[in-house]
Amino acid sequence: MSPLALVSVSDKTNIIPFCKDLVEKFGYNILSSGGTAEYLTEAKVPVLKVADFTESPEILDGRVKTLHPKIHGGILAKRSNEEHQREILENKLELIDLVVVNLYPFKKKVEEQCPWEEAIENIDIGGPSMIRSAAKNHADVAVLVDPNQYQNYIEEIKKGPLSKDFKTKLAFEAFQHTASYDSAISNWISKEKDLRPSNFIESYPLIKQLRYGENPHQKALWYGLNNIGWNSAEQLQGKELSYNNILDLESALLTVLEFGYETKPNIKTESIAAVILKHNNPCGASISNSASSSFKNALKCDSVSAFGGIVAFNANVDKETALILKDIFLECVVAPSFDKEALEIFKTKKNLRVLKLTKEMLPKENQTCSKSIMGGILIQDSDNQENSEDSWISVTKKNPTEQEYLDLKFAWKICKHVKSNAIVVAKDQQTLGIGAGQMNRVGASKIALEAAKEIDSGGVLASDGFFPFADTVRLADKYGISSIIQPGGSIRDEESIKMCDSRGISMIFTHKRHFLH
């Protein structure tokens, strides 16, 4: 008896040549339904329609086509089970040897912001049922859920009967496929109706296997959503991205996004930002009226740490900027756009990774962030709310000057992306010193202030958390700091305020903390 293949696909990529090969080279009969049957018939592929096979018409606007004992009995029957084979004969069923199914494009529809009713109609029922039936009975039935599997299947049946390992692998991929599909539906309803799931379910397709993780002895894989974020970034040149590159690129981009992000070169003057990042911490940042001047100012903060670092811009990178960058050893440069002349200059640094990530490639909604822990995972909202100044209060007798206020805003945005305890010293819209990841705030302050004094005197100071004591203010005064910005909220806030007043320092409370671990 000829093998029977059940074919029902939404993604019709390569389905015609695949089915022709099955029929002409391997003697398969094709069983199909709905649009797939019509599509194959038009291509002159002989097809038996499901409605004729089951002797039951499609009903309920096509909602019920393949949900029938003649379909699922033919898939689920175990060939080695005598009772199953007796029932197959008794009920005049035919065994189905291959199931080729992919599902309604639910993800694509909801990404297009379609109405609720249209999204519901794109929830596939019959497709997942056939896939799961075939995957369960994978000892006897092969199941294909992706056009990329077709050629491999042809190569395998050329060799003879399919191996147990091959069919098990197909079943594994099938269950992955249906699990991903169900998670997409669940997560969409959760977001649409603001429902908090009792189980965390998320599905990310494999992007690629990385050479290694943070260290060479650690294996690493990259999973992600298609056509968004780093998965959609265009790598214009350079070596393959590493695990550490991706982490640092993410941190650098999140920092530079604080100042806007424009694909076109005509971003407003005085708001072109450059951020240099190393080991997930900014080591220099600046905003000015050009990418080149912003980078040069950012580099002044810590040129030693910038060696082998990551640079992110929020605007076009031109020839002048590229000429400066090429003389420094950097791992990656990311920006929304690059001049042709800049890219030609970068070609002289063949190992430099240059990435173009346009504004359109960025996520359009607030995301969550997560951290693995033993036996679980922690999930929280991303700390990416706009820095509203409505809650800011000047708590000292002296108010910041106009320039100090601009510098405080700048330093506060950078401080948010520095590992806690974090202190940033800034002046004239550029960082002078950054104290990152210290176990006490005074220690972070000493690092930032000592670094700053090597570049310029004075400036403003930002802290990601409140001052538990007045010692940070006392230290800041010794280094000529004229204004401070911090969340406030300590039971000893008054001590810090009095210390500021006695030293002629202005201070703002933001009433928002930005710890980062």
From Swiss-Prot:
GO biological process, one term: 'de novo' IMP biosynthetic process
Gene3D superfamilies the UniProt entry points to: 3.40.140.20, Methylglyoxal synthase-like domain
GO cellular component: cytosol
EC number of the protein: 2.1.2.3, 3.5.4.10
SMART domains linked to this entry: AICARFT_IMPCHas, MGS
Protein name: Bifunctional purine biosynthesis protein PurH
Pathway participation: Purine metabolism; IMP biosynthesis via de novo pathway; 5-formamido-1-(5-phospho-D-ribosyl)imidazole-4-carboxamide from 5-amino-1-(5-phospho-D-ribosyl)imidazole-4-carboxamide (10-formyl THF route): step 1/1; Purine metabolism; IMP biosynthesis via de novo pathway; IMP from 5-formamido-1-(5-phospho-D-ribosyl)imidazole-4-carboxamide: step 1/1
Family: Belongs to the PurH family.
Gene source species: Prochlorococcus marinus (strain MIT 9515)
Domain MGS-like, residue spans: 1-145
Keywords tagged on the record: Hydrolase, Multifunctional enzyme, Purine biosynthesis, Transferase
HAMAP family: PurH (MF_00139)
Domain of life: Bacteria
Gene name tied to this protein: purH
Signal sequence segment: none
Molecular function terms from GO: IMP cyclohydrolase activity; phosphoribosylaminoimidazolecarboxamide formyltransferase activity
Domain remark from Swiss-Prot or TrEMBL: The IMP cyclohydrolase activity resides in the N-terminal region.
